[in-house]
């Protein structure tokens, strides 16, 4: 029989407190996920037995106004939410979530025709042996040449050009920094750095993870690892990390927390997506099981 005796369960999903509007009209304030996305809910009542349920709000308008507008009203959507949530939204990319290729980037130029959706991947993709890569030793350094940093880097709402020599930036993550990654692993990456000082995942390292290590999923702490860059570059060179991994049917799970608290360099990971067809991403409750007494 399978047993977790001798293992410690470590929470990898950030705890999120939703903002919720109760049926009595009261509002309970919430917070946002690590990426700054709000979790917004409306409470409803099930008439047959007077039980309560919650609706994940997709816009700032009240439910009735949303429904009425959706069935044929012309013009912009109503903007009269008592919650003041006009710019807030809920998608399957809120909180810790796993994303696949089909339905997410399948419209991009140059992606493989055989790219799969989450619902088409084997269950074993989302659980199993995982390499823990805490990259706290990759301290930011002064850039020596223009070519050793991504062409574009997001910071707040601005797009910065390539880093110039002498500027402080995160280091490139290389295969030599991931020596504990074994073939067929799930890989969990984190670092204590943020912003421009985060170590960044280069395309040559992603290629090594795909072709040599044949990893089955990549999990990323946030902040800590920069992997979403070159977003505005013309296809087929845009978003290279996402493009390469999802194109190889290797899902990405993020934003994760507590990776840096794991003492061992190997754990058992579990984090299942919802069993829903055509869902390009799914909420997950990600957990790492660390063997007690084991360390790196």
Role assignments for model-derived ranges:
Residues 1-296:
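Active-/binding-site microenvironments in catalytic and ligand-binding cores
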């Amino acid at each position: 029989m399978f047993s977790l005796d001798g293992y410690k369960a470590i929470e990898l999903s950030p705890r999120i407190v939703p903002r919720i509007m109760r049926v009595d009209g009261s509002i309970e304030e919430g917070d946002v996920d690590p990426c700054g996305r709000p979790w917004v809910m409306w409470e409803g009542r099930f008439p047959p037995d007077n039980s309560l349920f919650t609706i994940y709000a997709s816009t700032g308008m009240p439910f009735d106004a949303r429904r009425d507008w959706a069935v044929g009203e012309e013009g912009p959507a109503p903007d009269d939410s008592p919650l003041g949530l006009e710019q807030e939204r809920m998608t399957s990319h809120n909180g810790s979530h796993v994303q696949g290729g089909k339905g997410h980037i399948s419209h991009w130029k140059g992606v493989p025709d055989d790219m799969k959706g989450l619902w088409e991947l084997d269950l074993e993709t989302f659980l199993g042996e995982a390499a823990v890569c805490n990259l706290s030793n990759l301290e930011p350094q002064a850039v020596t040449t223009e070519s050793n940093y991504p062409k574009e880097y997001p910071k707040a709402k601005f797009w910065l050009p390539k880093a110039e020599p002498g500027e402080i930036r995160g280091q490139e993550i290389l295969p030599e920094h991931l020596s504990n990654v074994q073939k067929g692993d799930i890989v969990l990456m984190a670092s204590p750095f943020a912003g421009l000082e985060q170590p960044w995942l280069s395309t040559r390292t992603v290629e090594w993870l795909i072709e040599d290590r044949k990893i089955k999923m990549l999990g990323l702490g946030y902040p800590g690892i920069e992997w979403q860059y070159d977003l505005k570059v013309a296809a087929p060179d845009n978003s290279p990390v996402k493009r390469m991994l999802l194109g190889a049917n290797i899902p990405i799970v993020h934003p994760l927390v507590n990776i840096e608290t794991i003492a061992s360099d190997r754990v058992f990971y579990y984090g299942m997506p919802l069993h829903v067809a055509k869902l390009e991403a799914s909420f997950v409750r990600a957990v790492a099981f660390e063997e007690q007494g084991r360390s790196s």
